[in-house]
Design a protein with these regions (language model features):
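Active-site acidic catalytic loop and adjacent metal/ATP-binding pocket
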Residues: 39-46, 52, 126, 177-228, ...
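Active-site activation/catalytic loop segments of kinase-like enzymes and analogous catalytic loops
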Residues: 150-159, 226-261, 276-293, 305-313
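ATP/Mg2+ or Mg2+-diphosphate-binding catalytic cores
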Residues: 284-343
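Acidic, serine/threonine- and proline-rich low-complexity regulatory regions
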Residues: 260-272
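An alpha-helical support segment within catalytic cores of ATP-dependent transferases
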Residues: 12, 16, 21, 131-139, ...
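ATP-binding pocket architecture of kinase catalytic cores
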Residues: 38-147, 151, 157-162, 185-186
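Conserved NTP-binding catalytic cores of kinases and kinase-like/nucleotidyltransferase enzymes
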Residues: 1-91, 190, 204-213, 326-343
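Secondary-structure capping and boundary motifs in well-ordered enzyme cores
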Residues: 144, 193, 219-223, 271-276
Length: 343
């Protein structure tokens, strides 16, 4: 994570100053970090090995971060330690894992297969742990998976075809997904971190085993299908993996997966179904970020997301979904470059 220059408004914010004083941090210099798609902000306490997290707009996400950070640590994984938290102001003082995200490491030429293997092993550790799902988080169930597809219906579909009735499209679209998504939930349920990708993973070189993989941005965790986080990692909307790496890492996971997962064919089937759903949802999310939230930067990734969506639909054998998209949204397959330019 790169830091920005100290912000005077942050330094003088009485709410922040009061919170830090209660944590024994009265003279810290705060360095704001770049934001992401959420309203959450992070500020590094220069030279302290600690970071201030601020998220007053999402009490559920704030509480989720605090509880899941402790839970993941108890499971033997590396999540930031929470030194203090105030739900009323949405402020938390947390451990600073430093700057070496996977994204930074990969940009510097670090061995890609080694980093991804470490992340896969961290997922395997999580999925084998009998207490992984023993935490109070929402269920990632059929209703939720279908509801997420409505983002595509209400943002992507009318962008491509302004005359479309989003509600009618959504009803038919979701009906086509209901049976395959039911199948995607047929495996064992575990803790799903949901945004398990290179921007949210750190290499903690001073730690051993799977604890070398630092976990970030897990506050939206749910209980659901194990393969979902594998999709997040290996079918990243933001970057292409080197040729053959996705398959190699999928095979690495399958070789050591819990017996309850049902073997290679069952895991692979769920992996492709969840990938198709995820990319379809993200195509809608990126347009919503642009049109509703004024964040056009994510449109840059749309061509890749639509390619991944096509591959996922084909791999999952969702022929009826493909036919419906071809009929109702002609040209959707090649819409990525034009939509990317809109930002």
């Amino acid at each position: 994570m790169m830091s920005s220059p100290p912000s005077a408004s942050v330094q003088q914010d009485p709410t922040i100053a009061d919170f830090l004083a209660k944590q024994g941090e009265t003279d810290a210099t705060l360095l704001p970090l770049p934001g992401d798609a959420s309203a959450r902000r992070y500020m590094r306490l220069e030279g302290r090995g600690r970071m201030l997290m601020q998220d007053p707009s999402d009490p559920a996400g704030f509480a989720g971060f605090v509880s899941l950070a402790q839970h993941l640590t108890e499971l033997g994984l590396s999540a930031p330690q929470v030194f203090g938290a105030d739900p009323d102001t949405g402020l938390a003082l947390i451990e600073d894992f430093g700057t070496q995200t996977y994204s930074v490491q990969l940009a510097a030429g670090r061995d890609e297969s080694m980093l991804y293997a470490l992340a896969v092993d961290a997922l395997l550790h999580l999925h084998h742990h009998p207490q992984a799902a023993s935490v109070q988080v929402p269920a990632y169930d059929l209703a939720t998976l279908l509801e997420e597809l409505s983002i595509f219906s209400h943002w992507f579909a009318p962008t491509l075809r302004p005359d479309i009735d989003p509600e009618a499209f959504d009803a038919e679209f979701r009906d086509l997904w209901r049976e395959p998504l039911t199948l995607s939930l047929s495996g064992p349920r575990t803790l799903v971190l949901r945004d398990f990708h290179v921007d949210n993973l750190m290499e903690l070189s001073e730690r051993d085993g799977v604890r070398r993989c630092g976990l970030l941005d897990f506050q939206d965790g749910v209980t659901g299908p194990a393969e979902y986080d594998l999709v997040s990692l290996l079918q990243d909307a933001r970057r292409d993996l080197e040729p053959g790496l996705e398959q190699a890492m999928l095979e690495r996971y399958i070789a050591a997966a819990p017996d309850a997962a049902g073997g290679a064919d069952a895991i692979t089937r769920r992996y492709h179904l969840l990938g198709a759903q995820r990319h379809t949802r993200i195509a809608g999310v990126f347009l919503r970020l642009h049109q509703r939230d004024g964040k056009p930067g994510y449109l840059h990734f749309l061509p890749r997301v639509l390619r991944q969506m096509q591959v996922g639909l084909d791999a999952a054998g969702l022929t009826e979904v493909i036919a419906y998209l071809d009929q109702t949204l002609p040209g959707w397959r090649g819409a990525g470059p034009a939509l990317a330019k809109a930002g």
